[in-house]
Regions:
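A short hydrophobic beta-strand segment most commonly corresponding to one strand
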Residues: 104-106, 164-179
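Long hydrophobic alpha-helical segments typical of transmembrane helices together
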Residues: 185-211
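Conserved short histidine dyad/triad with adjacent acidic residue
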Residues: 84-98, 150-154
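Short acidic-glycine-tyrosine-enriched beta hairpin
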Residues: 118-156, 195-199
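Glycine- and acidic-residue-biased ligand/ion/polar-headgroup-sensing regions
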Residues: 101-120
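N-terminal leader/capping segments at the start of a protein or of a new domain
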Residues: 1-50
Length: 211
């Protein structure tokens, strides 16, 4: 198994990450990887025993705004795999944003409304650009439900917590999601760059590490 840094020490997380690395080593194809990870990921989502209280809190200083927290739970030594908990306060909506990585996203606590967008010029985003955006669908997610990300085809969305408690979604993504420079979009399709950051780990400051 490849090395990495764990920010939670609970056994279910260690077991899950071991399974993830085993799948990645056996399957170079992303579709096969996702298919093989569905069952262990579902089990992690359904186990309510392992996420410590400190990783269920909001973050007033979030890079996404609105008190949204991004708690890093595990990161590979090469920073090409991250498991994190996104905590969105009640009534708060994330910016429309992308992820720039394949992976799995599922709801662990609360309820979310997810709105996915199709972006026409998905290969060449620059700050200040205006891109054509069409809403693909709007759906409600409940605990245990999850979906796959496969950029660029379904990589742009926003979520809103519609439960009385904060929503917590678990993300398993193939990049250093909190520290890479990503894109967000306003309601008109105007593009801006942002870095969401991690609530429990600083990002490198050098420009070479930002992309």
């Amino acid at each position: 198994m490849s090395g990495g840094e764990f920010f939670v020490q609970e056994r279910p997380v260690h077991d899950f990450i071991a399974q993830v690395h085993s799948v990645l080593e056996r399957n170079p194809d992303i579709n096969q990887r996702l298919a093989s990870l569905r069952l262990p990921y579902r089990r992690l989502l359904e186990d309510q025993s392992w996420l410590p209280e400190e990783f269920r809190q909001i973050n007033p200083n979030s890079g996404m705004g609105g008190g949204i927290a991004s708690w890093l739970l595990y990161q590979s030594s090469t920073k090409d795999l991250s498991l994190f908990a996104l905590v969105v306060p009640p009534g708060v909506t994330t910016p429309i944003h992308n992820h720039l990585a394949w992976g799995l996203v599922g709801l662990y606590q609360g309820e979310q409304e997810e709105e996915e967008f199709e972006v026409a010029e998905h290969d060449h985003f620059h700050p200040g650009d205006n891109v054509r955006m069409n809403r693909r669908f709007l759906r409600v997610l409940k605990p245990g439900e999850f979906y796959e990300l496969m950029p660029p085809y379904n990589d742009v969305h926003r979520v809103k917590t519609i439960s009385a408690e904060p929503s917590i979604s678990l993300h398993l993504l193939a990049n250093d999601t909190g520290c890479v420079i990503r894109q967000r979009f306003d309601g008109t399709g105007r593009v801006d760059e942002f870095r969401s950051g991690w609530s429990n780990k600083p990002c490198p400051e050098s420009l070479a590490d930002r992309h």
